[in-house]
Regions:
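Catalytic cores of secreted/periplasmic lytic hydrolases that degrade extracellular macromolecules
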Residues: 1-3, 8-129
Length: 129
């Protein structure tokens, strides 16, 4: 799931935000000093995309966001239930609750499901190191 989101948000690591700011997940900030201003940002918008000193810090910030922000509360509840009942495809159960992650909402969910499926990212679901 996290790999799929990084692929989408960073354009396979090739976006300006990934290359200049180690930003894999497109997280927003209202502090322009801490981020990169999107080139095509609407005039009425004030956000920037958070930049990081390392890819590791980008991943850590994403994990903190997904595990604490109120917008992803339902995602966390479903994740907990899927783990307890050992749901056979926990990614499918969880991904539906990530529409709030992107401005495009349900289209983002569809895109994420396609990326996960077409790149066999489920193979990494139980990865241990």
């Amino acid at each position: 799931l996290a790999l799929g989101q990084a692929i989408i948000e960073s354009g396979w690591g090739q976006s300006r935000f990934a290359l200049e700011g180690n930003a894999l997940y497109g997280q927003w900030t209202t502090n322009e000093q801490r981020g990169l201003i999107p080139e095509e940002r609407d005039d009425d918008k004030t956000h920037a995309v958070l930049k990081f000193d390392s890819l590791k810090k980008s991943v850590q910030a994403y994990m903190h966001n997904i595990n604490t922000h109120g917008a992803y509360y339902s995602f966390r509840v479903v994740r907990r239930i899927a783990e307890r009942v050992q749901y056979t495809d926990p990614i499918s159960a969880k991904v539906k609750f990530l529409a709030a992650y992107a401005e495009i909402g349900d289209e983002y969910v569809d895109k994420l499901e396609l990326i996960i499926e077409s790149n066999k990212l489920r193979d990494f679901d139980r990865f241990e190191y």
